[in-house]
């Protein structure tokens, strides 16, 4: 009889322990169900890169003096600078410039140390290609300006991944329909236009007086 009661007691303890573990797992699941989504629906939604984002390098052919500083400061000696010496002007003349983004680590040293500021970082990060040779950009491809996320009518730009409004810490109390943090690009433009109009109106009133 005592053995039977012990078996029943052990079974009850194991059942309670199992139910406890299942309850803990379900509590985490239900907890995440009540939170707001943090997923960006790419490519229909895209984040607006920060001002210091290190994306594809932009190259201005007319500014380059073929000094090859970018090659010397590059950790992997990546930029290919092809030039010839002009005997009349006694200066280097750039013939061809290329960067292989399949190898580039986007450290930004070439941009930082360029004496003529012919290199700059852009916000372009969509560089995927089926052939690795297509990632080798020449001076023509490097000179192309990227298409900004804020100018793409087919994409909803998102300023940040922080969906919570200012001053709210607990995400569980925020409904999924509430406004995201930060202003949208069109709202920023409207705000700038409103400030500009107000300034012009104030200047006109001062002039009339």
UniProtKB/Swiss-Prot annotation:
Cofactor comment: Binds 2 [4Fe-4S] clusters per subunit.
Residues reported in the UniProt entry to bind [4Fe-4S] cluster 2: 74, 104, 107, 110
Membrane topology: Peripheral membrane protein
Cofactors (names): [4Fe-4S] cluster
Any Gene Ontology CC annotation: plasma membrane-derived thylakoid membrane
Cross-referenced Pfam families: Fer4_7
Cited Gene3D superfamilies: 3.30.70.3270
Family: Belongs to the complex I 23 kDa subunit family.
Protein name, per record: NAD(P)H-quinone oxidoreductase subunit I
Species, as recorded: Trichodesmium erythraeum (strain IMS101)
Lineage: Bacteria, Bacillati, Cyanobacteriota, Cyanophyceae, Oscillatoriophycideae
Gene: ndhI
């Amino acid at each position: 009889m005592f053995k039977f009661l012990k078996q029943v007691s052990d079974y009850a303890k194991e059942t309670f322990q199992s139910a406890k573990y299942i309850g803990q797992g379900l509590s985490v699941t239900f907890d995440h169900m009540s939170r707001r989504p943090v997923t960006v629906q790419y490519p229909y939604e895209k984040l607006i890169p920060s001002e210091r984002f290190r994306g594809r390098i932009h190259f201005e052919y007319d500014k380059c003096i073929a000094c090859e500083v970018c090659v010397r400061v590059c950790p992997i000696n990546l930029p290919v600078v092809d030039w010839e010496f002009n005997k009349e002007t006694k200066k280097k003349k750039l013939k061809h410039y290329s960067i292989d983004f399949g190898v580039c680590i986007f450290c930004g040293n070439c941009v930082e140390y360029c004496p003529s500021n012919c290199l700059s970082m852009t916000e372009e990060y969509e560089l995927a290609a089926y052939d690795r040779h297509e990632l080798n950009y020449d001076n023509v491809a490097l000179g192309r300006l990227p298409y900004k996320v804020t100018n793409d009518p087919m994409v909803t730009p998102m300023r940040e991944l922080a969906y919570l409004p200012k001053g709210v810490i607990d995400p569980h109390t925020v409904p999924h329909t509430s406004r995201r943090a930060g202003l949208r690009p069109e709202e920023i433009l409207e705000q700038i236009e409103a400030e500009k109009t107000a300034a012009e109106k104030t200047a006109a009133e001062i002039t009339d007086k």
